[in-house]
């Protein structure tokens, strides 16, 4: 089989799928991408694409994302045409992330080739991540911008032969006419790598961090420290917890940036705002930045309690991975988390908007080792049953072969 995978970042959600197909000499796997990030995969040919220009300066802000998607779509089309000549590759099936436009025109160059679209999110001005906070009211400008932002998603929904998304919650965001027939297949996590290590001690030599003597470690992971992922609420919760417990440490993995939602006031960052507020023992709060996979593993294997908070938005890999590590989890009582976590069975749920409740749930777990062990064991069992990448790749493989019939 000639399999073409498309994502602007390599390998992203398609790591395990690419590895699976690349193992067989009967398959040829090509990954069309904008950014390799220095990564390579055995037996996977990487082909780059680059838009010819940036979106038009001064273009209406509503349509700037659509123009960027068109530019990406044109760039991938040119790369696909070039592949046929330069590396003699013509796909039997195409699978790609539809969010940035790279898949837009694949059916125009390969009308007979099945196109499978990975659909991550459909935007709404209310009843979702936007206007979720009680005092938030989207402006008319926000509403019009978000409606227009869905334009290239709608083109992809119409163009793809097969559609899938990772969670039921994400599926529920799409228009009803496209939900019908949309498959739910999570990419899964590596349960062999994300495994418990009872008694693990946390030492990050590259970060100069030695918590091998720490009795309690609270962990938090996010690509960016920002409101969408409950960073301000987490910081307020740990102020409460650290004020009561003098031997507890907190480790935060992620970058001082905003990936989603509103930017902080000009010249500031959300992390900087919390540091200015203070009110916590900075000697026991450790911002370790972005970590390599082995150090990330060390953090979660040594975690006493892991906290994951999110608005009603895309569910992060890190939450599923923390459960696979057997962490005792406190998650936000929001739809994407509730799809996975049953309060008191495989984790705790807390009110996102109430830091006092988050702190209470953290302390309930810190005070009860037997409860932590029970919830952590159940959390890993949940992942083994529903999010094991080996099973999810098989499910996705069946989807691919089904599309080719």
PLM regions and their residue ranges:
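Acceptor-binding helix/loop patch of EC 2.4 sugar-transfer enzymes
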Residues: 53-63, 113-152, 192-201, 212, ...
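Carbohydrate-associated surface elements
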Residues: 169, 188
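Short hydrophobic beta-strand element within catalytic cores of glycosyltransferases
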Residues: 328-331, 341
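Conserved acidic donor-binding segment of nucleotide-sugar-dependent glycosyltransferases
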Residues: 343-344, 348-355, 364-369
